[in-house]
Every structure is written in structure tokens, then in C-alpha cells.
Amino acid sequence: MDEMDEIVRIVNDSMWYVPNAFMDDGDNEGHISVNNVCHMYLAFFDVDISSHLFKLVIKHCDLNKRLKCGNSPLHCYTMNTRFNPSVLKILLRHGMRNFDSKDKKGHIPLHHYLIHSLSIDNKIFDILTDPIDDFSKSSDLLLCYLRYKFNGSLNYYVLYKLLTKGSDPNCVDEDGLTSLHYYCKHISAFHESNYYKSKSHTKMRAEKRFIYAIIDHGANINAVTKIGNTPLHTYLQQYTKHSPRVVYALLSRGADTRIRNNLDCTPIMEYIKNDCATGHILIMLLNWHEQKYGKLQKEEGQHLLYLFIKHNQGYGSRSLNILRYLLDRFDIQKDEYYNTMTPLHTAFQNCNNNVASYLVYIGYDINLPTKDDKTVFDLVFENRNIIYKADVVNDIIHHRLKVSLPMIKSLFYKMSEFSPYDDHYVKKIIAYCLLRDESFAELHTKFCLNEDYKSVFMKNISFDKIDSIIEKCSRDISLLKEIRISDTDLYTVLRTEDIRYHTYLEAIHSDKRISFPMYDDLIEQCHLSMEHKSKLVDKALNKLESTIDSQSRLSYLPPEIMRNIITKLSDYHLNSMLYGKNHYKYYP
């Protein structure tokens, strides 16, 4: 056996599969032969320069032989996941070339190095690029690097050299993304975890410089992908922290905020749908748009609010800051409709309880129907995307006295539409309905005699489950009526939530010997709500008393009358009285 046969034997013994790309031109196509053994070795083996096999390959193999697919040994070694710079240098010293030869995909060895290398070595990069005068014949190198490495750390030496040696910044992949699209993805994906590590990350200096550089080298700032996204769309869609400096860099170099993607959304619309959106960047975008293209009309503002409520499920002050800003900037009133719905209808229809709760708090009427005469309950039950409808209905019921009695009564005819997996919330809903509506249980008893009524429960929650819940609630209500609280009873206090009785309710809530299985949660909610309201009323009265002088007509009112008047104010109005424009900071 000669040494070439020995190379084939050693490589063949270690390989169980030959990829199509490595098939040779000989009779043994699909197998390892003298024609492709060097390529297989350099592509898949952990090349050890001290090994016997490596020395045989160097001695007997043609280091520049190309397969019919175009792969040279240099192509193969640059795609080796165990690539070692010292090995490459030895191969080059032994005559390996083909720096600019292309495989059947149009890739030169540098493509594979950029794609497969875990970390780009500047010296190796120079070795692979210096023999090439310019990259005009391999114009997608910059796109290749960014496409495969955008979610990790980028080498800016590599970026700038690719850019300045002729790599086309307007090359696109099969989805229409350019280098700038991928770079915008990189800024979001990689810098989220590094944002506060240093001032350079916070100020995004390197990122801004490269954005300016790539545009100066001809990148189209408004290039659109196959789904219509510009680089600004792409950046603002990412679910990570955004930098106002990056946004400004894109805007100042000509990013058009009017361009709509295939979903008919501008970059501003895409941003407002993002849970990670912040008020200061939104203000920057809107101000820039209006300075460049004119003032946004009322209907455009309503549409932005609609998109925000429908898609943005962010929680906390950041989300509410945007909501308040949009309501104020576009002067949107509580009873104002967009298409057929108010903002509150949109919130409940799209399960955005964070927004809905705030809108109810500031005075939006939960009982107001849509223009086509639908209640918020109707919107929930008509939305097929809401699987667990009882969860959302419970969020509405949670507003208790703000929900009118006719609305409560309407739920009787929707009980059969609850899912059998919703029984936790169904119990809460039915318990409150029976508390508020004395006819609820009577109506159920009456309908029980009708077999058609029972049959409507066949598809979803069972009739027996509903019947059992109503029976338990009725039993607890009888007990609630027996508990005396001053001049009334516990049942009436829970129905009216009169804060005069909050101390009595607190005593009942803290007494572990008293329990109402179907109403314990409601008692706790009412206790906390009444306690909070009582404290607000006390603070408001103290502030009012400190500002009323003896000449004021209010000073003649008896304290109990004054307290009764203040008690009728909502939490929103009390907080506004106490804290003025800063009232939103005290939103519960």
C-alpha cells in the first residue's frame, strides 16, 4: 500500500458519510478517493500539525485541487469548526492558494471563514483578504458576515475593511434584508445584555459611527425587505432595549417614517406595538415625523392608540406613560369612538387588562356600548382568539360597582359559553353576579325546568358545574345576611362597599373563625378597596380643611356632610385633588 492509499484508508475509516458537496469526479463518486481525501480531511478532522496523517497530506495532496462543486482545500479548512490559525499558516507556506476562487454557491474561502469561525482573528482575516484587490466580485461579504454573526459580538476591523474594499452594502438575502437591516438587529440583540457595562455601550458611539459609514458608502437607508420593512422598521420591531441615539442616527441620515410595510405599518406604528417601547423614543419619533412631514391628524392619533392597546402588552409605568401621552397629545375623550369602539372597548376585546384598568380608573364608562350596540362582555365572547373567556370577564367584574346591574344580568345568558377549564374564574364571576343580582339564582331555578336550557351547556362547561356553584353561592349569601354590621348586614356592605363600615369588614376579614368559601376572596378585595378609599378620603379632607378659610361657604358645612361629599368622588379625582398633575404616580 502506497502512502496515498494510506491517507484514503485513514480518512475513510473515520468517516461514515460523504456529503454531496465533496463527491469527486472519478468513478468512485460518493466515496472517499484520492481526488477528495484532502478536502474531507481538512473539512472534518481536528487537524494536528504533528500527526503522521497531516505530514502525509502535506507531502502527497494537491492543496489547490478543486472539486466539481468548486470547493478547494482552502474552502474546506475555513469551514472546519475546529479551525486553527497556525494550521492555516503552515498550509499557506506549503503553497495553498485559491483565495478568490468560488464554489457553486459563489462563496470564496473568506465567506466560509466569516460564517463558521467562532471568533474572527484579524491576522487571519488579513491573510485571506490581502491577496484580493477588491470585493466587487464577491460583493455580499459584508452581508454574509452580518447575517451569520449579528446576534454576537462583531469585529469592527472586519466590518470596515469589508466595507472599504468594495463589499456592496445593498446586497440582499433571500428575504430582502440588507447589511443595514442585520446591523440594526445586531444592535438590539447583542447590546441588550451589554447596555450598562460601559459608557461606550450606553452612548452607542461605535454603532452610530458604523451606521454613518455604511450609509456614506452607499447603503440605502430606506431599502425594504420582502415584507416591506426598512432598517428603521427592523430596529424598532426588536423586543429589546432601544437607544435614542441609534434612532436619531437613522432618522438624521434619511430614514423615512412614512414608509409602510406589508402589514400597512409605518416604523412608528411598529414601535408602538412593541412591549419594549418607551415614551421618550416615541416622542422623538412623532416630533421628527411632524417636523418633516406635517402634523398628524386626529384620526392618525386614534389609530396609533388603537395599535398600542391592541398589540402592546407591556406592564408598569412605561406602558401607562405611553397611554397617557397618546390620550393627551391627540386629545382623545372618554366617550370618543374610533371606528365603532372607544379605547376601553379595544382594551377588553384584546385582553389588555393593564390599559383597561387605567382607563376605568380615569373615568371611562365600562357600561358604554359600542356604536353597533355591543357591551364589553359581547366583545370578549365574540373574540375567538380568547380561549379562556372567564379570565377576561373576571377582569371586568373585578371593577365591581362600576359594572352596571343590567350588565351583570346579561351574564346569565352567557354562562354556557365558559370553558370547562375556567371553573376557578367562573366561581368568582357567578359569586359576584348572585351578590349583585337577587334574581340571578331565581332565574336559574326557573330555567332548570327547561331541558333546552340544560342542553346549551353540552359543548362547554357542564350544567351540573354551574348548578353546583350557584347552590353554594346561595347558601353563603344566606349566611352573609345573618352577619350584622352596625345597622346593616355583611351582604349589604359587600353590595354597596360603603366605606363607613370598612373597620367592621376588616374585623370579619381577619377573624379566621368566620369563613364563606365562595366569598372569602371578595371580602378581602372589598376590605382592601374600602380601606384604600377611606385613607384617600381622610387625606383629601385634611388637605381641604387646611385650605378652607373662615370666609369660605364650605366652612359652614357640617363635617359629616363634607365627608359624604368627598366620599362620592372617585379615586382618580381624589388623587388629582391631592397630587395635581402627579396623580398618576399614585395609581394603584
Swiss-Prot record:
The keyword Repeat applies. Keywords: ANK repeat, Repeat. InterPro entries: Ankyrin_rpt, Ankyrin_rpt-contain_sf, PRANC_domain. Residues 557-574 are annotated as: PRANC/F-box-like. Pfam families: Ank (PF00023), Ank_2 (PF12796), PRANC (PF09372). It comes from the Viruses. ANK repeats lie at residues 69-101, 175-223, 227-259, 300-336, 339-368. Gene3D superfamilies: Ankyrin repeat-containing domain (1.25.40.20). Belongs to the orthopoxvirus OPG003 family. May be involved in virus-host protein interaction through the ankyrin repeats and PRANC regions. This is Ankyrin repeat protein OPG003. The gene is OPG003.
